[in-house]
């Protein structure tokens, strides 16, 4: 930061592919687009806002830990979110450190369909928050090692679902808390008037899920399970001009009955 007020506009397309075996067996493909704008107010504070759209396709086999359905089904979910984020940079014993926080809210629209043609739909209010902190170590001028710790929380309140045959599914308020500890290693390359960076970040993730589903004639069914997962993210960035920068990453989350690319 050179003392002048700086602004930044960014756009990020995204894709996730997940396979889950418990408590219900399903595959998911999620496409999304996020965009944001932030302002560097001074050397310590950056404030921004963002919007997000995601479209998820979830295919259920009908198999589960406690229940089995003769036919499978699918759920298509459209998610619309908006939020604020803030980054605080400081020094701790001569080392750079930062704290990143965000708040967001929005809604989800879900269309459900079984393989034998029964349909239903519902809407849900979604909100969440995230907090992450890191400390920067520089073993060399072009190498950075950054331990990080983060916590994320999401809460979704779906309306009662009623299908064409009169069956209902009433959701508790569904929530999930995620704790993550990781270490990011980054290498910087200088070329011309710009820089390119490559990084890898392995981490351990612990999730805590809450919320059941009450289905006509079946009673209460658990919706989310607690999981201990591993995660590896590989990515990089490159300066194209003094005003334009590109970045990309690929992540893989795994553990037990869960895999997400």
Where are these regions (language model features)?
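Membrane translocator/pore-forming domains, dominated by Gram-negative outer-membrane beta-barrels
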Residues: 4-261
């Amino acid at each position: 930061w050179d003392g002048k007020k700086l602004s930044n506009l960014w756009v990020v397309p995204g894709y996730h592919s997940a396979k889950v075996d418990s408590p219900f067996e399903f595959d998911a493909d999620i496409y999304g687009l996020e965009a944001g704008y932030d302002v560097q107010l001074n050397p310590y504070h950056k404030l921004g806002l963002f919007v997000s759209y995601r479209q998820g396709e979830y295919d259920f086999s009908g198999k589960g830990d406690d229940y089995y359905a003769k036919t499978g089904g699918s759920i298509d979910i459209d998610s619309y979110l908006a939020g604020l984020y803030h980054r605080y940079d400081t020094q701790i014993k001569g080392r750079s450190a930062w704290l990143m926080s965000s708040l967001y809210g929005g809604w989800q629209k879900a269309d459900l369909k079984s393989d034998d043609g029964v349909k239903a739909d519902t809407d849900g209010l979604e909100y969440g928050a995230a907090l992450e902190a890191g400390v920067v170590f520089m073993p060399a001028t072009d190498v950075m090692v950054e331990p990080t710790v983060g916590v994320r929380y999401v809460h979704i309140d779906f309306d009662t679902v009623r299908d064409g045959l009169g069956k209902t599914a009433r959701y508790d308020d569904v929530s999930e808390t995620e704790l993550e500890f990781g270490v990011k290693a980054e290498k910087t390359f200088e070329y011309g008037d710009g820089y390119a960076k490559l990084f890898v970040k392995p981490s351990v993730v612990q999730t805590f899920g809450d919320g059941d589903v009450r289905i006509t004639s079946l009673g209460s069914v658990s919706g989310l399970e607690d999981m201990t997962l591993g995660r590896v993210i590989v990515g990089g960035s490159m300066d194209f001009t003094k005003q334009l920068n590109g970045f990309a990453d690929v992540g893989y989350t795994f553990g037990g009955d869960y895999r997400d690319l």
